Amino acid sequence: MQINKYIDHTILKADAPKSKVQQIIDEAKKYDFMSVCINPTWVNYASQELKDSDVKVCTVIGFPLGANTSELKAFEAKNAIENGADEIDMVINIGAAKSKDWDLVESDIADVNAVKGDKLLKVIIETSLLTDEEKIKACQIAKAVGADFVKTSTGFSTGGAAVHDVKLMRQTVGPDMGVKASGGVHNLEEAKAMIDAGATRLGVSAGVAIMEGLTSNDSY
């Protein structure tokens, strides 16, 4: 198992300085992680820094609340791609999901999916705020719209990835769609548990600790 290729090496804290973003980029190069996941303001910089590597640039859209309008999310995604993003992690309209307004949840994802081109779209459903029934429905919609991944969490809500949720998401979307476990993975043991549950990508700030067999208490 090349666990490094499961890892989106992540820094999304509002107060992360350029030096911390550079550290994440340098570590991603060293360990050949799948991507760096950074806020949109850093996308162009990271794209330039990583242009001679295999590391992808991932960013977040409608983050972390998912409460922007669909039009704004689509603009954010288009702008990020123009700046060099390879992968887009968008937050669903969580309030719409809790209201059972599934048409809005669907159109919201579809509007972003329509501008992704050949880039990857991951759909964050924020599992800690949804019932199992709502998680299943959100995953079904993301798959039907044409997203590439479903993702558990932003890392900024009431909880992160749980094995139960990853299993449920994998069962819902089947074997061919990506599932990203994000938030709360601190070491190799926890990373392996998520992969065993069906995760094909891990959103972590503990990428180095996972590679070194250590435990990290870092958050996003």
Curated annotation (Swiss-Prot):
Its EC number is 4.1.2.4. The active site is at residues 89, 151, 180. One of its GO terms (molecular function) is deoxyribose-phosphate aldolase activity. It is an enzyme of class 4 (lyase). Pfam families: DeoC. GO terms for biological process: 2-deoxyribose 1-phosphate catabolic process; carbohydrate catabolic process; deoxyribonucleotide catabolic process. Belongs to the DeoC/FbaB aldolase family. DeoC type 1 subfamily. This is Deoxyribose-phosphate aldolase. It comes from Lactococcus lactis subsp. cremoris (strain MG1363). The gene is deoC.
